[in-house]
Amino acid sequence: MIITKTNKTEGFSLVELIVGIAVFLVIIVAVYNSYMGVFNVVYASRSKIEAIALINEQLEIARNLPYSEVGLVSGIPTGKLIHSQILNRDSYHYSVTTTIRNIDDPFDGTIGGTPNDLSPADFKIVEIEIDCSNCKNFTPMVVTTRVAPKNLETASTNGALFIRVFDASGNPVSDANVHIENNNVNPPIVIDDVTNLNGMLQIVDAVPGINSYEITVTKPNFSTDETKEITAENPNPTKPHATIVLQQVTQLSFIIDRLSIFNISSVTNTCDPVSSFDFSLQGSKLIGTDPDVLKYDENKVTSGAGELTLSNMEWDTYTFTGIDATHNVVGTNPLLPTSITPGSTQDVKIIVEPKDPNTLLVIVKDGVAGVPLSDVSVTLTKTGFSANGITGRGFLGQTDWSLGSGQATSTDLSMYFSSDGNIENQNPVGDVLLKKIFDDYVPSGNLTSSSFDTGATSNFQQINWNPIDQPVSTGNPNVRIQIATNSDGGVWNFTGPDGTASTYYTNADRNIFSGNNGNRYLRYKLYLDSAVTTATPNISDIFFTFTTSCTPPGQISFSGLSSGTYSLHLEKSGYVTQDVSVPVSVSWVSKEIVFVPI
């Protein structure tokens, strides 16, 4: 028998090849990542070691200087050290910032205190901060040391400058940037520092000088406050450059807060845009008196689309005045002057029409609430002339809840829809507050209003209430409000200023969330809270302002007037009728009338 032997050679299949390559790549990537990880650790460690060595080097320089020379060039205290410098070590670029402060130790009294320390610069704090611009994973380092004199103190020949920074609510602002210059000494003094957690910066042992210290306080996304030079244009600044007096403390307060935005549009009364409308925008804050010098006073112009956005606006009360050659202002929405709160966005519509030739703008306000008054009948007459109209709806609201709950629509303004039973509405009449059980107020309660009908599709502007100031002991917030709107009076979804159910209006004079625009009916839900049982917040009135399309609230204009003296007759049910004379001698005249309830 013949035996045949066959050799069979097998190779790798495609699947086996792919799997093998994948495994190989995983191993290679793992090895590479491990190598890079070790490399990065070594790299980061090396940069940190260099930074620590650099800090020690700077501290040794400070330690080896005479005490009188431990200070900053052009700084306070004055000395040999440089405030900011870039140092290179092994291809690393380090930014080194040195800050030195005189410290007034309370052990022997403080300047201006009891006892009064006539030599307040007891010791110095040296702070070295280092950062690296081209290092990977580098965390900035800060090292602080204390330097004290060897000898006994002697009476100081300098003074002290204490700077406090607050926000619009009076709260201290920490980490505010403070820039100080004194160019009346040689070398000039230049200090850049920040406020502490209490919003304070203390400069001890400052060289005396009259109106010598220029101070500017800033913070990212905040407004700016500063001292001003005495000039011919501003002979009496409200906050002149600081004066330092021998062995005295000069204290200055600065107020800064978050910047806001104005969205301004120039339109007709049918909401058609009017391009390139010129106007003057003025704030109410003063930087000088006798004569008054405004902090903000600028001329502006809207775009070709009739729009203008002004960012970086400081909180203030602003007035818009038309200076356009072809158009007059016939109304604004909201009513001017308008206030903008810190960190907010305010939409303003300036309603204009062509000059023809003279225009009278009549503004009617409620004498109690101070808000624009709707449905006022206005008649303007002169010999051979008569015209009449009605002011646009301005506000709806409530000043009495004494007739209780159970009313779905606000036909009786002394009633409301419902409450949780913890609201007192009759003692006193005209106010709502937390219910009192025996001698204790309940901790919280809420009330839902009847529905208010604005009469047409509306743009809702602001929610307001009084009193604004509530008992401090009740906590904060102690008054909260949510708003619900719809177009048919059906479903009510209550929301806050960001359009969600988790937020509340907690400050009076708040802008209503724009998502409510386009609706007709409104309800509010009032929440009262107290942190104690001995006091309660109270509300005497709640009201909201709105407009229908581009009809300005509480305003009416008359155009095509000739020069002369006109008679105004104004009447509205529930108010004292008024007759007023108005001279019209220029192209645009504004007359504000306050209506007093009967």
State each model region's role.
Residues 159-167, 254, 260-268, 358-366, ...:
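A short, amphipathic beta-strand motif
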Residues 183-205, 285-309, 383-392, 548-557:
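Short, acidic Ser/Thr/Gly-rich low-complexity loop/linker segments typical of extracellular
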Residues 197-215, 219-221, 298-326, 552-567, ...:
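Short Pro-Gly-centered beta-turn/loop motif in secreted/extracellular proteins
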